């Protein structure tokens, strides 16, 4: 790679953020560097970024940070100030779980409750990119299957930070232990899926119910034409109010809602249904989504 000062720094790009202390992030980064050609970008002296590169095709930037991802509130402004404006931010990251499940995941960020222990602000949601989440998760599913990887490919619910971002952002992750974070096959699958990302418009839903791994929403995302923006699991529905639902709709472009009904308490269904009715958003059942938005044969 040669050092090149970008000729048009005002041109927004899909920007992949890789964190130095994150093993999965470094794994994905190494594959990104090998899968396509990049040119180094000169950073201003005041920039806190470690390095920045742009793909030769001009579609992506790859930016290195020394901190962890979740506390990167205001990152879009920092990128802009460094002459690296982003149209979409993809955080290449590790996923950790107590169950230590082999996993490839995507999700958007936000703090539905009044707490923000892992970055972001309480009761604030980030702008999501349902199209990017659908594209990357579908790519992960396809490529992991071709490699016969024993990984769960799943959509996670909205959680942690950063939330203070004015451009869309998503996480693309490898989980859930050091063994998987450094797995070269998983790193390759994640990197290829990111580089193949499509931002083609898709029908968007906001999801309610289910667990942290939104299994029913994952099935609908992978098996129909729709995608999801924000998803709220059953254990956080008590925090859902009109302001939060309004945020979820406005920051994802949601056109309708989906309930994982059996997982939801009746009082939560009633409360959220009334909010959605007030906002003019209909609730579609799984059967209706599959009928109206089924994949073409």
UniProtKB/Swiss-Prot annotation:
Monomer. Its EC number is 3.1.1.96. SUPFAM superfamilies: AF0625-like. One of its GO terms (molecular function) is zinc ion binding. Its cofactor is Zn(2+). Keywords: Hydrolase, Metal-binding, Zinc. Coiled coil: none annotated. D-aminoacyl-tRNA deacylase with broad substrate specificity. By recycling D-aminoacyl-tRNA to D-amino acids and free tRNA molecules, this enzyme counteracts the toxicity associated with the formation of D-aminoacyl-tRNA entities in vivo. Belongs to the DtdA deacylase family. GO terms for biological process: D-amino acid catabolic process. It catalyses: a D-aminoacyl-tRNA + H2O = a tRNA + a D-alpha-amino acid + H(+); glycyl-tRNA(Ala) + H2O = tRNA(Ala) + glycine + H(+). InterPro entries: Deacylase_DtdA_archaea, DtdA. It is an enzyme of class 3 (hydrolase). Binds 2 Zn(2+) ions per subunit. This is D-aminoacyl-tRNA deacylase. It comes from the Archaea. Gene3D superfamilies: AF0625-like (3.40.630.50). Pfam families: tRNA_deacylase (PF04414). NCBIfam families: PRK03995.1-5.
